[in-house]
Amino acid sequence: MNTLIKIRDLSVHYDSHRVLHDVDLDIYADDFLGVIGPNGGGKTSLVKAILGAVPHSGTIEFSPSLYDGTRRLIGYMPQQSNFDRAFPISVRETVVSGLQALRRMSGRYSREDYAAADRLLEQTGLQSIARAPIGEISGGQMQRTLLCRALIAEPRLLILDEPANFVDNRFEGELYELLKQLNERIAIVMVSHDLGTITSVVKNIVCVNGHVHRHESNVITAEQLDNYNCPLQIIAHGHVPHTVLEPHK
């Protein structure tokens, strides 16, 4: 298997509080990983450590295939709450800003950059609001905008933090179908609290609650969740079976 990222003995601390403990995890080129766990369990901290956004101990090794020159080919879609919607920028400009690191020397975007943004906006049904300020669009439209922004630099690994938040039911299905298509050529790591939906989309599950456990399947039993102290609810969505797991003591 082509390993994109090899994590060994990773720990993340905030002041004196250790959020992640001695994590070992491999991420492969064909992965579609669903990252689940309780609030405060370390899901977002794991993502931020991979992105180099938080101090940590241990090692994170990146495959040469994740680089184009010195540029690391990782796309990131943050939680919407981490994005300032009061900033005066349009949907289209937000998408093309995903190329900012590439265009830092010239300081400007090309016609081809905007054409790439327009293609993504059309693919996600946002072309009609391309020039709208982000402060005037819906939560679901903002999620799609951030997804386009994460994709515009053509990453080989896409990391998504709760991508279906605020998205309506119709586009949620389209979103997951798009991600499945993308996974034919890139690896995806998706953080989600909705176990009922995520298990129907991803290939493998990573359970995070201080420690990290990777399952080579998208099926998680109540017993496994209990063993890893991972108190989650499975919520019914359409034909998905309705199962409720009791909170752990």
Per-region residue spans from a language model:
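Conserved ABC transporter NBD signature motif
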Residues: 55-74
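Conserved ABC ATPase "signature" region
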Residues: 111-129
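The feature captures the beta-strand-to-loop junction immediately N-terminal to the Walker
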Residues: 36-38
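ABC ATPase nucleotide-binding domains
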Residues: 219-249
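Conserved ABC ATPase signature
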Residues: 133-137, 141
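Catalytic Walker B motif of ABC-type/P-loop ATPase nucleotide-binding domains
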Residues: 158-162
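Conserved structural motif at the start of ABC-family nucleotide-binding domains
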Residues: 5, 19-22
